[in-house]
Regions:
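Generic detector of multi-pass transmembrane helix bundles and their immediately adjacent loops
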Residues: 364, 380, 392-557
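Core alpha-helical transmembrane segments of integral membrane proteins
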Residues: 344-411
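Hydrophobic, aromatic-rich alpha-helical transmembrane segments
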Residues: 2-11, 341, 345-352, 388, ...
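Flexible, active-site-adjacent loop/turn segments at secondary-structure boundaries
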Residues: 181, 189, 198, 205, ...
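Membrane-embedded alpha-helical signal segments
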Residues: 2-360, 378, 498-557
Length: 557
C-alpha cells in the first residue's frame, strides 16, 4: 500500500512539474512576444495587453483604455480606444468616436447585409452588377469616423508617438492597423501681447507655447503658398516637435539645407526650449555674442522670412529662432518699419550710442581717473578729486561694487512678482546709491556713471545682446584699470577682430560692413520705404528684388 501511495505521489509530482513548466514556458513566450511587439497584429487581446504593459496602466492614472464592441455586417468586433486624459477633447471622443462606433453604425449608415454596388449595366435584358466586397477597414474610416484627421498606422512606435502628443488610437479586432485620430484638446495660453518686446505702433500679438498656434500666426501674416513649414523631431525621449519655416521661392537652398542638417542631427534625450536648441546649433558657443535671433513677435519673424531667412519654432516655447543673424539685426527694433525713416534712424542712432556707453563708459571712467587725469578740465578734475577725498577704497573696488550691486538689483526685479518688480529696482537703486554716498563708500560721480550705464543698457532692443554687453563691460573695466586707454584700445581691437571672424550659418556676423557689400540695403540706418528695393545681398536669395524700382506708381500717373 505504501509503495502504491509513493508511486502515485511521484507520478502526480512529475505531472505537476511538467504542467508547471509548460505553463511557465507558455507565459514566458507570451511575455517575450508582447515585449518584442513592434507592429499591430490582428489579435485584439495581444494589442490590448501590449498597450497596457507599455503604458503601465496599473500605475498611470491618466492613461485611458476604453474597451467596447463594434457591430458591422451583423457581426460584433472587439475594439478599444487608447488616449491620455487631459490631452484630448472629451467631447470629440464621446460624440465623434464612441457614439459613431457604438450607436450610429447600427442605424444602417452602411448596408451591412449587402455588398456595395459600384456599377450597373443592362445587356440583353440581363442586369449585370459589379459589387465591391465589404471591407471593415474602409467601412470604419469612410463611414464611422467623422473627424478631419484620421491616419492608418501599423507601427506601435508611430501609434505611441501620436498618443503622447494628444491623439486617440482605435484598435479593432481582425485589423492589422490602428487609427490615429486627432482629437487634441489640452489647455493652452491664449494669444497675448509680447511681454519682452513691447512696441507702441504695430501688432500686439505674440507667440504662445502651442506650435500649431504659432504656425497659424505666421500663416495669417504670410498669405502665400510658398511658405514651407517642415516638421522635425528632436530628442529620443522627449520627441520635441520643431518646425523649420522658410519661403521656398526666396530663401537660399544651401541655408535651408544647413539648418535642416543641424537640427536633424542632434543626438540628445530631451529638448525643452528654443534656448537649448540655440546653444546646440550655434557656430561658436565659446563666445557670449548671440549668433541667432530670438523673438516672440510673429510680425518680426514674418519680416525675416520675407527677407530670405529661416525660422525655427520649438513646441512648448513662445520664442522662435531666426537665422542667420548679423550685428545690425540686434540693433533693429520691430517698431522701426512702422515709423518714418527719420524717426527710426534717430532711434537707431540713440541705440548705437547706448551700446558704446553700456560697455565702454565705466572702463573709460576708470582709465581717466587713474591714468589720464590731464584730459579733464581743471574745475572738473578738482571736483572729482574732492568727491573721492573721503573714500577709503580704490576706484576699481568702488566701480565693481556698484556695478555688481546694480546687476543684483536688476536680477531681483526680474525674479519678484511683476507688480512690485519695477518698484524694487527703482527704490533699491535710489536707496543704495544715497546710502553709499552718505557713508563715503563711493563717490557721487561714480553713482552718475553707473546710473547712465544702466539706463543705456535698457535701450538695447535685444535682451541677449544686452546681456552680452553687460558681461563685456566688466572686461573693459579691468583693462582700463590695468593699462588705461592703451588697454581699452587693445581690448577694442581684439573684440572687433572676434566680431569679424564669427559666422552665423555661413554669413559673416559683421555683414554688410565686413566684408563690405551693399550697405544701403541692410546697414545700420534705414532708407525711405520706397527705396528699399532689394533684399540683403549677403543672403544670396533666389529673388533679390523685394519691390519694383518704382513702387509708388500712383505718383507717375
Amino acid at each position: 500500500i505504501f509503495g502504491v501511495r509513493a508511486l502515485l505521489v511521484t507520478a502526480v509530482s512529475v505531472v505537476a512539474c511538467v504542467a508547471f513548466e509548460w505553463l511557465y514556458c507558455k507565459l514566458l513566450k507570451k511575455a517575450n512576444l508582447i515585449s518584442d511587439l513592434s507592429a499591430v497584429v490582428t489579435g485584439i487581446s495581444v494589442n490590448l495587453e501590449y498597450v497596457k504593459v507599455k503604458y503601465n496602466t496599473l500605475i498611470n492614472s491618466d492613461i485611458v483604455v476604453r474597451e467596447f464592441t463594434l457591430t458591422a455586417r451583423n457581426r460584433q468586433y472587439s475594439a478599444f480606444l487608447l488616449f491620455i486624459d487631459g490631452m484630448v477633447d472629451s467631447t470629440l471622443v464621446n460624440d465623434n468616436i464612441l457614439e459613431a462606433l457604438m450607436l450610429r453604425n447600427r442605424a444602417n449608415i452602411f448596408d451591412g447585409n449587402q455588398n456595395q454596388v459600384i456599377s450597373e449595366a443592362k445587356t440583353n435584358n440581363i442586369t449585370v452588377r459589379k459589387v465591391k466586397k465589404f471591407d471593415l477597414d474602409t467601412y470604419i474610416s469612410d463611414c464611422l469616423l467623422p473627424q478631419n484627421s484620421v491616419k492608418k498606422i501599423n507601427s506601435f512606435k508611430d501609434a505611441f508617438d501620436g498618443v503622447n502628443v494628444g491623439d486617440c488610437l482605435l484598435f479593432v479586432d481582425t485589423l492589422e492597423i490602428a487609427y490615429d485620430i486627432d482629437v487634441k484638446g489640452f489647455k493652452q495660453r491664449s494669444v497675448e501681447s509680447p511681454n519682452n518686446e513691447v512696441i507702441i505702433k504695430g501688432p500686439q500679438e505674440g507667440f504662445v507655447e502651442n506650435i500649431r498656434t504659432n504656425t497659424s500666426l505666421l500663416r495669417r501674416i504670410i498669405n502665400n503658398e510658398n511658405l514651407i513649414i517642415e516638421s522635425v523631431e528632436v530628442g529620443s525621449l522627449s520627441k520635441t516637435q520643431c518646425c523649420i519655416c522658410y519661403m521656398q521661392d526666396i530663401a537660399n537652398t544651401d541655408l535651408v539645407a544647413e539648418v535642416k542638417y543641424r537640427v536633424s542631427n542632434l543626438k540628445i534625450d530631451a529638448l525643452l526650449s528654443s534656448g537649448e536648441l540655440q546653444q546646440l546649433i550655434e557656430d561658436k558657443n565659446n563666445y557670449t555674442i548671440p549668433q541667432i535671433i530670438s523673438t516672440e513677435r510673429p510680425d518680426k519673424a514674418a519680416k525675416h522670412l520675407y527677407s530670405g531667412k529661416v525660422v525655427v519654432i520649438v513646441n512648448g516655447n513662445p520664442y522662435v529662432l531666426i537665422m542667420p543673424a548679423t550685428l545690425t539685426d540686434f540693433i533693429a527694433s520691430p517698431e522701426d518699419s512702422n515709423l518714418k525713416f527719420q524717426f527710426a534712424n534717430f532711434s537707431k542712432f540713440l541705440r548705437l550710442i547706448s551700446i558704446f556707453i553700456t560697455f565702454l563708459l565705466p572702463g573709460l571712467y576708470v582709465a581717466i581717473s587713474d591714468f589720464h587725469q590731464e584730459l579733464l578740465p581743471t574745475e572738473l578734475l578738482f571736483s572729482v578729486i574732492a568727491s573721492r577725498e573721503n573714500v577709503p577704497f580704490p576706484i576699481i573696488f568702488e566701480i565693481l561694487l556698484m556695478e555688481i550691486s546694480f546687476e543684483l538689483i536688476r536680477e531681483a526685479g526680474l525674479r519678484v512678482p511683476s507688480p512690485i518688480g519695477p518698484t524694487i529696482g527703482i527704490v533699491g537703486a535710489l536707496v543704495l546709491g544715497q546710502a553709499a554716498v552718505s557713508a563715503n563708500i563711493v563717490s557721487p560721480i561714480l553713482i552718475i556713471v553707473v546710473a547712465i550705464t544702466g539706463i543705456a543698457s535698457f535701450a538695447i532692443p535685444d535682451f541677449y545682446f544686452g546681456y552680452h554687453l553687460r558681461i563685456l563691460r566688466f572686461g573693459f573695466i579691468l583693462l582700463g584699470y590695468i593699462a588705461g586707454f592703451f588697454g581699452i584700445a587693445v581690448g577694442l581691437c581684439i573684440y572687433v577682430t572676434i566680431l569679424c571672424s564669427i559666422k552665423s550659418f555661413g554669413v559673416p556676423f559683421m555683414a554688410p560692413y565686413s566684408p563690405i557689400t551693399n550697405i544701403n540695403e541692410s546697414g545700420f540706418f534705414l532708407d525711405p520705404m520706397w527705396k528699399r528695393e532689394k533684399r540683403p545681398d549677403y543672403l544670396n536669395t533666389k529673388r533679390q528684388n523685394s519691390q519694383s524700382h518704382i513702387s509708388r506708381t500712383w505718383k507717375y500717373k
